[in-house]
């Protein structure tokens, strides 16, 4: 019996074959995948659903955003939200462009009418710069220890209800939320499985994010329905190494997977190279039945070449199945199961996408909406139970997408041949498809112009796509009107570099850039450029001379300004670049931007790994954004040097370097470290954020021996980065006292301090400081770092009383959570030094009495430690209110959520940063 609700797919799979598995490879891990049975997945998701149901933002039947960067989290929380009776809405990866990212989050909030998103602690920073959506870190929900829900809220759903929200391609534009019902999804899965039967004891293979309709429906849900295993791998690992893709298919006896045309070409090239090697690899692909291919045009020659190669390893000749589908049709719904023979027989340069599966119908119409006979080009329209019914909260887009008689207008053009096979012939709407991903040309143009690139005239930028003869995927072409003189070659090169950087960060693809004179960029009477006319002129070759001259001038400029490596580090990096790009030193030097060699996102990933191997990193530790922002060997060498070079003691730690407002300075708590501020700083994007870190952590450093010593060091550190005010300083707990003292010193020297913040510390602290000996400091540190629980720290305080430091240290290491200890990369010597730093900080404050006044004070108060006050009101009114004695104006109090140790932790940092930013604004900062 066919299930009617999506949760039934998992429940049935868990009951029918509890050993069916989800197999997951993490980034860079090719040897030791994680495996979770369908039975265990149901239990895990059921536990997580309790946390969703109990969250303060929970509303039955509402949409819940999911934003994760790995398959396991997406899968678990997809089911958790469904089982809690809500609608999962899986977000695509956010843009690297901060402006686009914030705009997208605000758009998601207004579209879904939601103000929260489940995510991971590692991704909290991606929600910076906006207040529309609060990120909720799943690590803070404590769901692992919950009991599985006895029954699920989802059983109340009806087959026609929305089960899942997926977003149309909107990497650079405003995406639409597609409502996919239980009935629609189940109908689509049944239709897909009927097209090509799959063998038992085989598996599905997915390598794209679960936000993509092909991953969540065509692989994850269909595998459950078919009672087969499913394998999920990171896309970057597969795309950069097609041979591993073949290894995976052989290892896991994959019967169904997918690959767009560009990746089919990479697999073909890898197999050709393998055949030429001295010891060619062999694979058993006899279980492979179905390599679905779509998202961009498939060349018949590529499909034919690869089909022949795969056939030699046991796959059927028609294993590559070009098709057509959209998010609105639950991915592929029209399939060509006779490729490449059918396409060769009919002399097609680009393959047909075939005929409809059960559950969908197609027609091709003219401009009046009348169906056209075979062979005539028109608009492709679809209908049937597999086709969606509406975009969420967007009636205008929904109405525009359907004909009066209820057919969905795909926006694509095509013809039906005499056999009812569909041959696509372009898109009615302006869309760019790069490596199977859609982008809006208008939004790319906007991103370029919003960067105010010197050398580019605003409103004369035009972006479009073009598929060159013999190419496997489209390229982005961008033409613009320059402001520089034609003979200003440095400006010409700098403008091209700036444009390339913006487009690469937005799309992962390097654009083909051509500066044109204004006569070639005519505007309409409404002041608009005609993208279609400009594209047609480009494809007719009318810009070929301008393009050739531009390339030649920039190449000569690079040659004339060629630079040699300054040191061995630059030399080593240059060799990696040359080897990765397979170019000579005549073509590339330490100051050549990587965009100049035509690098794309896949080659960038390969370059990143080559550099990591050269530097001896065991794991992928260089953030990709480092390569995107530092595009020459020289820039990258400097950036890596700053990241990893040991430094002499400097109290200043740069947590966030960007923004045009005056910096915010944050002073460490009693532990001396500034790690606690990292998540907070990520949300403050309009100003630099610096932290002041205590002395004594590095070998050979001595901790501060007095408050004056620390204040002088911090004062000098502040002045070295920010010579002039107005200043904004704040401290967490113990750091509040130091922030107050540094503020006084600044004012004494004639500077304006406009903001002083105390994060939950009263002015009088010496009695508490005297209570904390070395053992207590270490126990507080262990609890603060989540190595032990607060309860256990109090028990150990008694058990370890009177013992020597070495014994105490070893006892706490033995008690520590081993996974957390390893996660923090702790060692016995470092933990001992850390305890020394914390103890010395408390010791030097044992006689501290506050005196003097600062202009103002903002106190951010949370639930206090039990030892400090009996209630929050007592804490504020009796203890914290004493700051009034040390300010020249009344203290402003800010009630913040959480407890003393969690107020700026992952669970509460989003709310805290909103209150902090508001307080800064109220002080004129």
Curated annotation (Swiss-Prot):
Q: What is its EC number?
A: 2.3.1.-
What happens when the protein's gene is inactivated?
Answer: Results in white conidia.
Asked if the Swiss-Prot or TrEMBL record annotates the protein with the keyword Phosphoprotein, the reply is yes
A GO term from the CC aspect: cytoplasm
Source superkingdom: Eukaryota
Question: Pfam family of this protein, just one?
Answer: AMP-binding
Domain Carrier, first and last residues per copy: 564-644
Positions of the UniProt region annotated as Adenylation (A) domain: 11-434
In which compartments does the protein localize?
A: Cytoplasm
Its EC top class is transferase
Q: Which GO terms describe its biological process?
A: fatty acid biosynthetic process
Q: What induces it?
A: Expression is induced during conidiation.
Q: What this chain does, per the record?
A: Nonribosomal peptide synthase; part of the gene cluster that mediates the biosynthesis of Asp-melanin, a pigment that confers resistance against UV light and hampers phagocytosis by soil amoeba. The nonribosomal peptide synthase melA converts 4-hydroxyphenylpyruvate (4-HPPA) to aspulvinone E. The tyrosinase tyrP then performs hydroxylations of both aromatic moieties of aspulvinone E. The product of tyrP is highly unstable, and, due to the high reactivity of methides and ortho-diquinones, the polymeric Asp-melanin forms spontaneously.
**Entry text on domains:** MelA has a A-T-TE domain architecture. The adenylation (A) domain recognizes and activates the aryl acid substrates, and loads them onto the thiolation (T) domain. The thioesterase (TE) domain shares the missing condensation (C) domain function, and is responsible for condensation and final product release.
Q: What is this protein called?
A: Aspulvinone E synthetase melA
Gene source species = Aspergillus terreus
Q: Gene encoding this polypeptide?
A: melA
């Amino acid at each position: 019996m066919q299930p009617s609700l999506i949760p039934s797919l998992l429940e049935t799979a868990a009951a029918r074959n509890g050993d069916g598995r989800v197999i997951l490879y993490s980034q860079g891990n090719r040897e030791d995948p994680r495996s979770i049975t369908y039975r265990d997945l149901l239990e895990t998701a059921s536990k997580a659903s309790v946390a969703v149901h109990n969250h303060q933002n929970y509303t039955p039947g509402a949409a819940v955003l999911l934003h994760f960067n790995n398959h396991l989290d997406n899968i678990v929380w997809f089911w958790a939200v469904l089982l809690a009776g809500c609608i999962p809405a899986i977000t695509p990866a956010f843009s690297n462009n901060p402006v686009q990212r914030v705009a997208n989050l605000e758009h998601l909030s207004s579209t879904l009418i939601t103000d929260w998103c489940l995510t991971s602690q590692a991704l909290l920073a991606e929600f910076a710069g906006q207040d529309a959506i609060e990120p909720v870190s799943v690590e803070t929900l404590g769901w692992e220890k919950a009991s599985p829900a006895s029954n699920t809220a989802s059983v109340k759903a009806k087959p026609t209800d929305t089960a899942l929200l997926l977003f149309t391609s909107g990497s650079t534009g405003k995406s639409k939320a597609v409502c996919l019902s239980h009935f629609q999804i189940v109908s689509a899965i049944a239709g897909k499985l009927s097209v090509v039967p799959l063998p038992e004891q085989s598996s599905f293979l997915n390598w794209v994010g679960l936000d993509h309709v092909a991953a969540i429906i065509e692989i994850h849900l269909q595998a459950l329905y078919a009672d087969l295993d499913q394998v999920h791998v990171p896309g970057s690992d597969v795309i950069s190494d097609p041979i591993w893709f073949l290894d995976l298919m052989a290892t896991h006896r994959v019967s169904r997977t997918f690959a767009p045309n560009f990746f089919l070409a990479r697999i073909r090239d890898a197999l050709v190279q393998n055949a030429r090697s001295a010891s060619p690899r062999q694979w058993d692909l006899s279980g492979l039945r179905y390599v679905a291919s779509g998202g961009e045009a498939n060349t018949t020659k590529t499909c034919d070449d690869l089909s022949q190669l795969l056939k030699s390893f046991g796959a059927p000749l028609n294993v590559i199945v070009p098709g057509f589908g959209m998010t609105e049709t639950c991915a592929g719904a029209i399939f060509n199961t006779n490729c490449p023979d059918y396409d060769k027989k009919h002399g097609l340069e680009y393959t047909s996408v075939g005929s409809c599966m059960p559950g969908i119908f197609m027609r091709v119409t003219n401009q009046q909406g009348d169906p056209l006979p075979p062979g005539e080009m028109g608009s492709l329209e679809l209908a049937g139970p597999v086709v969606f019914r509406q975009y969420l909260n967007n009636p205008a887009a929904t109405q525009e997408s359907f004909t009066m008689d209820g057919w969905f207008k795909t926006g694509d053009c095509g013809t039906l041949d005499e056999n009812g096979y569909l041959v696509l012939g372009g898109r009615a709407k302006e869309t760019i498809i790069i490596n199977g991903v859609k982008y809006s040309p208008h939004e790319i143009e906007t991103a370029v112009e919003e960067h105010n690139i010197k050398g580019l005239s605003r409103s004369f930028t035009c972006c479009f796509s073009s598929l060159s003869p013999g190419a496997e995927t489209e390229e982005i072409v961008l033409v613009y009107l320059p402001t520089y003189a034609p003979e200003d070659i440095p400006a010409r090169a700098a403008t091209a570099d700036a444009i390339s950087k913006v487009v690469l960060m937005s799309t992962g693809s390097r654009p083909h850039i051509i500066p044109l004179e204004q006569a070639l960029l005519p505007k309409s009477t409404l002041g608009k450029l005609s993208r279609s006319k400009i594209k047609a002129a480009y494809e007719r070759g009318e810009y070929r001379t301008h393009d050739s001259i531009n390339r030649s001038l920039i190449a000569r400029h690079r040659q004339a300004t060629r630079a040699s490596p300054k040191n061995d580090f630059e030399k080593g990096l240059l060799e990696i670049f040359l080897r990765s790009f397979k170019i000579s030193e005549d073509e590339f030097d330490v100051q050549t931007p990587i965009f100049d060699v035509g690098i794309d996102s896949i080659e960038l990933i390969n370059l990143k790994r080559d550099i990591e191997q050269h530097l001896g990193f065991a794991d992928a530790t260089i953030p990709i954004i480092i390569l995107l922002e530092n595009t020459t060997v020289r820039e990258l060498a400097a950036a890596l040097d700053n990241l990893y070079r040991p430094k002499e003691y400097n109290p200043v730690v740069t947590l966030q370097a960007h923004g045009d407002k005056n910096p915010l300075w944050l002073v460490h708590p009693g532990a001396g470290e500034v790690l606690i501020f990292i998540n907070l700083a990520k949300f403050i994007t309009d100003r630099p954020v610096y932290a002041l870190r205590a002395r004594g952590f590095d070998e050979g450093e001595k901790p501060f021996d007095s408050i004056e010593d620390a204040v002088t060091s911090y004062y000098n550190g502040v002045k070295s980065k920010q010579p002039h005010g107005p200043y904004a300083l704040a401290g967490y707990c113990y750091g509040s006292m130091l922030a107050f003292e540094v503020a006084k010193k600044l004012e004494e020297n004639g500077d304006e301090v406009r903001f002083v913040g105390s994060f939950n510390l009263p002015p009088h602290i010496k009695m508490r400081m005297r209570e904390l000996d070395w053992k207590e400091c270490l126990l507080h540190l262990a609890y603060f770092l989540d190595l032990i629980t607060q309860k256990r720290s109090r028990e150990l305080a008694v058990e370890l009383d009177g013992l020597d430091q070495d014994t105490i240290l070893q006892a706490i290491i033995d008690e520590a959570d081993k996974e957390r200890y390893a996660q923090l990369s702790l060692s016995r010597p470092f933990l001992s030094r850390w305890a020394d730093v914390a103890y010395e900080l408390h010791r030097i404050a044992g006689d501290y009495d506050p005196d003097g006044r600062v202009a103002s004070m903002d106190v951010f108060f949370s639930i206090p430690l039990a030892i400090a006050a009996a209630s929050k009101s007592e804490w504020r009114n009796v203890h914290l209110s004493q700051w009034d004695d040390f300010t020249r104006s009344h203290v402003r109090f800010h009630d913040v959520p959480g407890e003393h140790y969690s107020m700026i932790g992952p669970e509460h940092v989003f709310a805290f940063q909103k209150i902090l930013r508001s307080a800064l604004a109220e002080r004129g900062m």
